[in-house]
Curated annotation (Swiss-Prot):
Disulfide bridge map: none
EC number: 2.7.7.18
Species the sequence originates in: Mycobacterium leprae (strain TN)
Keyword GTP-binding on entry: no
Pfam families assigned to the protein according to its UniProt record, in alphabetical order: CTP_transf_like
Primary gene name: nadD
Function recorded in the entry: Catalyzes the reversible adenylation of nicotinate mononucleotide (NaMN) to nicotinic acid adenine dinucleotide (NaAD).
Identification of the protein by name: Probable nicotinate-nucleotide adenylyltransferase
Amino acid sequence: MGGTFDPIHYGHLVAASEVAHMFELDEVMFVPSGQPWQKGRHVSAAEDRYLMTVIATASNPRFSVSRVDIDRTGPTYTRDTVHDLHALNPDSELYFITGADALASILSWQGWDELFDLARFVGVSRPGYELGQEHITGVMGELPADALTLVEIPALAISSTDCRQRVEQRQPLWYLMPDGVVQYVFKRRLYRGPHGVAGTGRLTTPSLVVGNNT
């Protein structure tokens, strides 16, 4: 499962678990973004986001964490992520799992036309959005039926934005994310800066999930 994970929370974990079950995936790889190119806000340091993701996923044997985006220089583009994962797992079928709201903007992503040749897409519901055909426009509506699946994730009402704001406002994080991540956030004093985050000034991309099956 990929994205900024700033911070990772139970919404990410539930989405990954539900999609893994639905598509009988052997593994869900969480891929923290390195230097994302799209969202216009500051994010926490890549190593902090990577370590929080490792802590959050450690207890699930089906979950793993990849450094493929963090270790790549330059901005993080989904096309590069999927290409690299294909190279590392040439015999696997990849699934690109993202928020349903992000599907409407996918045509603006660099190399979007290559993505459907590399992976199947799964759009999951996110806070404040309803699944529907309005998320699929233009070229996307002409794709083969199995190229894109919409999935509603139960009780997916937690967001990273809310978690950051709760820290800034000195509100509790318990039960919104694994205990180890809560402890890491406070030990590292994350999300207490002027923008509600501590980090390197890098920008973020839409959340995504990449998994594979046999």
